[in-house]
Amino acid sequence: MLNVFREINNNIIDDYNMYTASPNIASEREEIIQEGLAKLIVPRIELYRREDGSIEPAWMPVFYNPHAVVSRDLTVVFLKTTMNTRNFFYIDLLSGTGIRGIRIGLEVGGYGLLNDVDPRAYYYIKRNISLNKLEERLEAYNQEANTLLNMLVFSGIFVDYIDVDPYGSPVPFIDSVFKPLAKRAFIGISATDLAPLSCTHPHKTLVRYWDRCIKVDFSKEYALRLLLANIALRSAALGFSITPFLSMVHRHYVRVFLEVERSYSRAYKQISGCLGYIWYCPDTLERGYTREAIDVPSCSSGKKPVVFGKIWICNTTIPEIAEKALREVNTMNFLNPDTIKILALLKNEAEINTLYVRLDKLCGVLKINMPKINTLITKLREKGFKATRTHMDIRGIKTTAPLEELKEILLKSS
């Protein structure tokens, strides 16, 4: 399978001396780090610190973000959970240093194509594949992402998993990513443009993601559901349906793992059932889902709610997948502790398909001090409601309790 790409790739000059005379030795401006089971040559991280001490990956000659380790951990856990064979074919579309694709190869298996349009990234990928002794199963590639995906359509090779992890929005790649997939396959997509996704820049939200948004207290969940809606609409137009298996918001990015099936009928059912609207009362913080924009209740204040969408209104994570993934991490002692914490919360959240509530905002409306979140969750559960913290916001909870019930408990606790 990889021989097809090796023949095409021979047109690219294979000259390791561009960076170093010895491909497995880091130069003075590089270092070798370990993430998961992988060793990696990367630009020396300390050279790219801001004045406030934070790392700025965009300054590096080849992009490597140490803060995205949870995203890469979850990629490995997700594939170990869903792939029934080690003999699958995957593409790391925007590979940078190659870390995600190399970790998949080492920690899960499969045959991979690690691609980046930047020639400098291509050489890093080549070196890191060699450093991890994966030459037999992984191939570095140097091509514009959409061009590569469209080439695959005519190659007769079907892909089982494609990972899209851009710097910014994934929108330029979404339409192309479905075309070379097998009849049933998986994709992992990241979006780091949280500002438009969470309505910080409403004009960009409209142009890029097709929604006239407003500021809400559940902005991170709005970002997640808006991204899913956009992917669902684009995939349905091409005859594909998506099912979110795992979805999260962490630090600066949204990350979704989706099952994809080639079926117009399933795509129709999905668009009909899972795309709808959110109604929201800014003064009282009441909110909810509706399939039709005209089918909304009035706010308790007597005002009309704001309605926006289209938005994804079905589950964003399958409870059984989160539970299975959580069991899988017990066999992987090299994962970041935050990954395990997020998976545990995802498992609880997956059973509650409501928008999270920012307790500090709600307590501000009620003019009371915010109680301890764990105490509040216990009281909600004692009343028979499901309730949990959310991984998306440390001040937020998800619960099946109506907002009026939540307010009543808060007022009694104040």
Can you annotate each of these PLM segments?
Residues 1-414:
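SAM-dependent transferase fold signal centered on methyltransferase-like domains
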